[in-house]
Structure formats: structure tokens, C-alpha cells
């Protein structure tokens, strides 16, 4: 299945590192609601170690937070999935705290998006 054929934008970790949040948001049509699929394995494991398959070199937690926050202000977010949290692989509560920060930003972005007309 080709995601782009169906109008789905997919960004790899490397693409996220090369692009600014605003450049990514500009690729999303204003009149189409956004669904965010967030795989925690792709976030820098030094900041979020609580995953099964950590990938070094991924975007920072602050970058992902900034991107989600900006999306919530500029586009209508339809929904979010948040996958691959694995508490058994956490270092203390580092990954838990990072995940909670992400969830807080996601909830805030979803609340902000309710103010945006499609």
C-alpha cells in the first residue's frame, strides 16, 4: 500500500531532522484534518529510553513537542496514536516523564484544534 497515493504524508526520522516544523506543517493542506501517528521508538533514546527498539539519531523530544504544539495551533487534528512505550526498558522514570510531557502536549494540541474551523 502506497501511503502517498492516498494523500498521506509520511516523514522519517531523518526527514524530521532535516526539516523545520514550519516546513512540515506547510506540506499539510489547511482544509484536511491531520491524524498523527507517533512511534516513540523514533525519538532520541537518550531522552526517551522506554521503548523496545530504540533508534539512535532520531529527533529530539523538544522538536517533537514543538511540532505537535505548532500543528495544534495551525491545523485541525483529528486524532493521535502514541505507540511503543515500554516501561520495562525505562531508565528510572526518564522515559515515563518524557512520555507524560508528550501526552500533555498532545492533549493541549487536541484542545487547541477544536477552535480551528476545517
Predicted regions located by residue number:
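Conserved alpha-helical scaffold segments that buttress catalytic/binding sites
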Residues: 1-118
